């Protein structure tokens, strides 16, 4: 995908950029991402952590089956994969810090996705992550605003009248001055 974007970019009418949404538990990807950042191949870098929701979905047969299907693994192999990834959770903070250093050195803007506490937002800000993408509650959005961070919410949230997850309503955040970017979505 990245190679195709780079190949086609000069021919495209729109200013096309590469936004990498990195799942923080994908620790094995760190060396490659660091190289891409160093090489100037990433234009925007986001930290995503969906591990808790992945683990919670294991107890929901429909969601679990959908995840297993997407991987192409057997149910047993999928369970082993999730367990192996979860046990490496203690490595995530250091990996995030190294990637933040690499992104800062490369001049790449960073986003944190689904910040769920003001403390989480402050921790990401301390690493140079100046964009809060879809903060999950008003307190966290307010922390982002008070810290001078950009705050992103999704336009589908506005159109639907609320978040598909049941979290923060973007229209409420906009009305309170707690949204600086409205994204069309991915």
In which residue ranges do the predicted regions lie?
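Metal-coordinating catalytic core of metallo-dependent amide/deamination hydrolases
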Residues: 1-115, 127, 133-135
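Active-site-adjacent C-terminal substructures of enzyme catalytic domains
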Residues: 18, 109-186
């Amino acid at each position: 995908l990245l190679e195709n974007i780079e190949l086609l970019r000069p021919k495209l009418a729109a200013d096309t950029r590469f936004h990498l949404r990195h799942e923080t538990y994908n620790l094995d990807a760190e060396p490659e991402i660091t190289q891409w950042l160093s090489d100037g191949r990433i234009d925007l870098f986001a930290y995503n952590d969906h591990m808790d929701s992945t683990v919670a979905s294991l107890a929901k047969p429909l969601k679990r089956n959908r995840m297993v299907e997407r991987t192409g693994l057997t149910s047993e192999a999928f369970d082993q994969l999730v367990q192996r990834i979860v046990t490496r959770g203690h490595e995530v903070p250091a990996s995030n810090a190294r990637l933040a250093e690499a992104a800062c050195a490369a001049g790449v803007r960073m986003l944190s996705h689904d910040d769920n506490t003001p403390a989480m937002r402050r921790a990401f800000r301390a690493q140079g992550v100046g964009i809060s993408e879809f903060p999950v509650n008003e307190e966290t959005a307010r922390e982002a605003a008070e810290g001078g961070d950009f705050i992103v919410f999704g336009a589908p949230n506005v159109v639907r009248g609320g978040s598909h997850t049941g979290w923060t309503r973007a229209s409420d955040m906009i009305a309170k001055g707690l949204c600086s970017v409205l994204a069309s979505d991915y």
